[in-house]
Amino acid sequence: MSRRPTRLRDGPSGAGAQAAILEAVGDQIDNDDPPEVRQAYERLRKLGHSVGDARKLIAACLSVEIWHTLHPQGGGYNRERYLGALKELPQLPESLR
């Protein structure tokens, strides 16, 4: 049975992975690559989400893609799935609900 991706959690378990994913999100926002990440970030901020919460929501979408890339049955990275998940924020990707 394959495991589904889990939400980013606070605490010592997975803290390094969470920090790395949040750093990657920051890089995507700063570099405007892909531009849909910055668009999602700006939209979430306009909806009233804090800087940290907006980044964590985007990180949740990125974590799903990382899972799909690393898991043997994950099927690999899918840009369209990632961009689609960003458009749906603040609703989390289905695999995290």
Where would I find each of the regions flagged by the language model?
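Structure-specific DNA junction-binding interface
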Residues: 1-97
